Amino acid sequence: MNKLTTIESHFLQQQKLYPEINSEVTGLLNDVAFAAKLVRREVVRAGLADILGLAGSTNVQGEEVKKLDLFANERLINAIGQHGRFAIMGSEENEETITPPKFESGEYVLLFDPLDGSSNIDVNVSVGTIFSIYRLKSDNPSQASIEDCLQKGADQVAAGYVIYGSSVMLVYTTGHGVHGFTFDQTVGEFLLSHENITTPEHGKYYSVNEGSWNEFHDGTKLFLDYLKEEDKATGRPYSTRYIGSFVADFHRNLLTGGVFIYPATKKHKNGKLRLMYEANPMAFICEQAGGRATDGHRRILDIEPVELHQRTPLYIGSKNDVLIAEEFEQDKR
């Protein structure tokens, strides 16, 4: 693999290999990569730029908004919307859909979480941006509406995430494998570092907030107990790895193998993660890498959304681990 393959060169290569990845799609992805550079610049200097801490408001989810959340949200909307490729957008931070600048020529829909895990930014823990791209269903971009956003995850054109950690990586899929790029600040470019990522069928880690144990249903508790039992034949016990930043936990498990779960609980019967902004894009990536993603009963990508900020339980990661989790959730074990 050529370590000096820029993300733009890679997109052009993909465009030649797969006719459905046209210049518009590669343009969309380049826009996202550019926006990620802007967010990355502020994330790495957040402590010096007075954008740490709370902004004094709450978002549509009822969560306190961090200053950096607002910055990332604004930068993504402005940087990605300026080229007229998107007719409509949806952000985890905005209650309503967003009409971007130059929307009149847009043929696509963008849904994104501008800064996932931002509650960790004040203590220098990895955070990330998650994005999802769909084709516009409306014939006329000026008529784009929330209905264009409410599409199944299986209809995604592309999805990806950017993780801002010890290095900055952009990972994406268009349905033709999963590829990762590491940002080289000396040249200011994302360079191909992880080509055709595949995730192990069996993992060795599980990621869950066990502080919610008393809120878990019996199936979830039994699955976690199963992972902790010693059985050399199945590689158990698993080790716990939980950062509390979904992008960071997912990224580690994608590369090393494992399962991330955010189940339904007695307090949150529909789960807590957002279907459109978090579960769908990560499920697309996970499946393309050979993994599996469900809500415990259904494939995530098959769920018909009814709300822009719809929530869902999530079991995602190594295929066999998720299958076992489903068996416990469905009382088959």
UniProtKB/Swiss-Prot annotation:
Positions with a binding annotation for Mg(2+) 2: 113, 116, 278
PANTHER family, per database record: FRUCTOSE-1,6-BISPHOSPHATASE-RELATED, SEDOHEPTULOSE-1,7-BISPHOSPHATASE, CHLOROPLASTIC
Residue intervals passing through the bilayer: none
UniProt superkingdom: Bacteria
Enzyme class: hydrolase
Subcellular location: Cytoplasm
GO cellular component term of the entry, any: cytosol
Main subcellular location of this protein, as a coarse class: cytoplasm
EC number of the protein: 3.1.3.11
Subunit structure: Homotetramer.
Protein known as: Fructose-1,6-bisphosphatase class 1
